Amino acid sequence: MLKWIKGGISAVTGMAEPEYGKDYIHSVADRVKNKQPYRETSREDFFWQAPDHTNVESVIFYFSDLKTGIFGFAQVIHSNIIGLHTASQFTFRIFDSKNPEDLNIWTSTKLENFYIEGPNFYADNLSVELSEDGESYHIQSSVCDLSVVDLHIRRLTPGAKIGDDPATYYGNNINEPWGSMRHVFWPRNACHGTIKVKKEVIPESDEEESSADEDDNEDEDEESGDSEEESGSEEESDSEEVEITYEDRTITFKEEDPAISTFIMAFQGMKPHHAAKAWNFMFFHSEKYSAVLMEFTTPKSYANTKISAGIITDDKEVLAMTTNNLVEHLNSEIDSVGWKVPKDIKITFKGINTKVKDEQLESENGTEQALQGEDEKEDEKEDEEEEEYKNVAEENKICAVVEGPLNNLVERIDVMGEIPSFVKNIVSGVAGTKPFIYQYADPKSSTLQINGGEKIHGVAWTEVTFISESDVISEESYNEA
C-alpha cells in the first residue's frame, strides 16, 4: 500500500520515486509475448483521450522529401498538470538537410480556445481533422505568421499498434495504474500541400556586430542583477525597435509527387521524467520501404526497463511489427552538456511477418493437461507456446537493420528551456534530470537491409533524448531527491 500511495503522489507531483522494480511496470511487449504483436489500427484508436489527471498527449506529422532532402514536422501537444492546468501548443519544424544554413525554422505557439472532438483538434486558427473513412488527415495552421501550414496526410499502408491495447502501464495493479504510455502509428503516408515560412534575413555585415552585442548584454545582465529590472525593460524596448527583415518562402509538396510522412499519436499519463529516462526515435524512408522505431527506457524506479516498438513496411503493407529491437549508439562522445552523444546509429529489428496469425503460434497441445495441477499446466503451456513460437517465427522471420550517420544535427533542444515554468519547477526538483533532445536529418547515407538482402538507401530522421542519469540500479539510485 505504501508504494501505491508514493507512486500515486509522485506521478502527479513530480517528486522523486522510490524503488518499485519490474513488477510495477506492465509492458505492452510482455502482453504480446509469443503472439503476433501487430494489430491494424481503427479510426477510434486516434481519438484523443484527454483524461482529467496529469498527462501529455500529442499528434505529430513528420514529412520528408526524398528528392530535396527537406524534413520537418507539425505537432499539436495537449497537456494537463495535476488536473488544474490545461494547455495546448503547436510546434513546427522545417529543415533542409542538404543546405542546413539555408532553411532551419522552428516555431512553438501557444494555442487559444482549443477543444477536442473525437479524433479532431481545433483552436483559434488551427484545425487537425481525420477523415470519416480514417484514411487521411488535414492539418491547417496559421497560428504563427512564421509558419503557415496546410498539409494533407494520406495513408499508404495500414496503421499499426502493438496488440489490442498498445499501452504500457505503471503501478502494482494494471487495472488501476498510476501512469501509462501509449503509441499508435501510421508508419508510411503521402504528404502534399503547402508550407509558407518567413525566414529571418540577417545582413552579413551585421552578424559579427550582433553577436558581440549579445555577449556584452549577457555580461551586463549578470552584473546588474534583478534590481535593475527597469533598465532591462528599456533595453528590451530598444531591441524591439530594430526592424527585422524576413524572406517569404513557400514549400510545396505536390499530390502527384508527395513527400513521405510518418504520423504518431502518443499519450503519456504521468510526469515525463517518471515515465522514461531516455528515448530513441527514428524513421527511414525510401522509394519502396519504410522503417520506424519508437523506444524508451524507464528510470531506475522501474528497473531500467526497455519498451520498444518497431515497424517495417513496403510501399503498401506493414511487413512486421517488432518489439525485440536493439539500438546501438556508436562512436559516442561526451558533449558540452555532459551527455554521451552518438556519432552513428545502428538499429536491428527482429520480428515475424504480419501475415502470421495468433492461431498459428498457439500450441496444439496447450489444452491437453486437464488432469494436471494449475501451476504445472501453466508452466508446460508457456514452454510449449514459446517452442511453437520459435518454430513458426523462424519460418516467417523479419530481421531488418537500419544504419546511418548522426553528423547532420538539426538542433540540440534544451527541454527545460521550452517547457512552462510551473512544469520546469516540478521537473528540476529531481537531481540528475537534464533533458535534451538531439535531432538529426540524413538525406542520403542511411540504409535499410531486410533479411540479409541488398542495402537500400534512403532518408532518415533520428531523435536521441536523454532525460535523467540512471544507468546502474542500487539502493542509492532510488534516492534522487
Curated annotation (Swiss-Prot):
InterPro entries: Ceramide-binding_SVF1, Svf1-like_C, Svf1-like_N
One record GO biological process: ER to Golgi ceramide transport
GO molecular function, one term: ceramide binding
Biased amino acid composition, Acidic residues: 203-245, 373-388
Chain segments carrying region Peripherally associates with membranes: 1-18
Ranges for region Disordered: 197-251, 358-389
Post-translational modification: Acetylated at the N-terminus in a NatC complex-dependent manner, which is required for membrane targeting.
Gene ablation phenotype (knockout): Leads to an increase in cellular ceramide levels and a decrease in complex sphingolipid levels. Mildly decreases cellular phytosphingosine (PHS) levels, with no increase in dihydrosphingosine (DHS) levels. Sensitive to Auroebasidin A (IPC synthase inhibitor). Simultaneous knockout of NVJ2 to leads to myriocin sensitivity (sphingosine biosynthesis inhibitor). Simultaneous knockout of SUR2 leads to a growth defect.
Alphabetized Pfam families for the sequence: Svf1, Svf1_C
Membrane topology: Peripheral membrane protein
Primary localisation category: Golgi
Localisation: Golgi apparatus, cis-Golgi network membrane; Endoplasmic reticulum membrane; Cytoplasm; Nucleus
Keywords: Cytoplasm, Endoplasmic reticulum, Golgi apparatus, Lipid transport, Membrane, Nucleus, Transport
GO cellular component: a single term: cis-Golgi network
Note: Present with 45200 molecules/cell in log phase SD medium.
PANTHER family assigned: CERAMIDE-BINDING PROTEIN SVF1-RELATED, SVF1-LIKE PROTEIN YDR222W-RELATED
Similarity remark: Belongs to the SVF1 family.
Function noted in UniProt: Ceramide-binding protein that may transfer ceramides from the endoplasmic reticulum membrane to the cis-Golgi network membrane, and is thereby required for the biosynthesis of complex sphingolipids. Required for survival in response to oxidative stress. Involved in the diauxic shift.
UniProt protein name: Ceramide-binding protein SVF1
